[in-house]
Swiss-Prot record:
Pathway involvement of the protein, from the record: Cofactor biosynthesis; pyridoxal 5'-phosphate biosynthesis
Species for this entry: Corynebacterium diphtheriae (strain ATCC 700971 / NCTC 13129 / Biotype gravis)
EC numbers: 4.3.3.6, 3.5.1.2
Family: Belongs to the glutaminase PdxT/SNO family.
Reaction(s) the record says it catalyses: aldehydo-D-ribose 5-phosphate + D-glyceraldehyde 3-phosphate + L-glutamine = pyridoxal 5'-phosphate + L-glutamate + phosphate + 3 H2O + H(+); L-glutamine + H2O = L-glutamate + NH4(+)
HAMAP family reported for this sequence: PdxT
Active site: 78 (nucleophile), 168 (charge relay system), 170 (charge relay system)
Name this polypeptide is given: Pyridoxal 5'-phosphate synthase subunit PdxT
GO biological process: glutamine catabolic process; pyridoxal phosphate biosynthetic process; pyridoxine metabolic process
Length: 185
């Protein structure tokens, strides 16, 4: 099994460290050819608008969209969730992949100073996670399953082979969500 990690910007190093700790072969994804032969893809947190601009600059956005729409399993955190869905009130010129049938509100939990750690039930796993300028899902299409909530906020979803979270398990050293996703591939 070879898992790609989108390494345009953001928190990809923590995801790579988790894959290495689990003994999973991985490849950094920056250009379209890096997608060839992957069994799954991790889209990390970071800044969704920068991720979008860089993916377009490297001619990666359309191949990413095609690979995901053709069934490539995806594990996404924070900005990765935003990049997969549709954004409520997007930044000027911001584009997303639109592969996940959700509408996302950016920075739903406040600014950087409002970041917090929490234990969140994700389909029976009490996951230790970090919320850092975290988004929330404000609407889901019929094919989307809600997998995690914090109060009234939807913070985890699954659609087919896409598992997406508003939070950062990797920042808290939480590996069980990665393990569950890898086992589902």
């Amino acid at each position: 099994m070879v898992i790609g990690v989108l390494t345009l910007q953001g928190g990809f190093a923590e995801h790579i460290a988790i894959l290495e700790s689990l003994g999973v072969e991985h490849r950094r994804v920056r250009v379209p050819n890096d997608l060839l032969g992957l069994d799954g893809l991790i889209i990390p947190g970071g800044e969704s608008t920068v991720m979008d601009k860089l993916a377009r600059a490297f001619d990666l956005a359309e191949p990413l969209r095609a690979a995901i729409n053709n069934g490539l399993p995806v594990f996404a955190t924070c900005a990765g969730l935003i990049y997969l869905g549709t954004v409520e009130n997007p930044a000027k010129g911001q584009q997303t992949l639109g592969c996940l049938d959700v509408v996302v509100r950016r920075n739903a939990f406040g600014r950087q100073v409002d970041s917090f750690d929490a234990v969140v039930d994700v389909e029976g796993i009490d996951a230790n996670v970090a919320f850092i300028r975290a988004p929330e899902v404000i609407s889901c299409g019929a094919g989307v399953t809600v997998t995690a909530r914090v109060g009234d906020h939807v913070v985890g979803v699954r659609q087919g082979k896409i598992h997406a979270y508003a939070f950062h398990p990797e920042s808290a050293g939480e590996v069980r969500l990665h393990q569950a996703w890898l086992a589902s591939i």
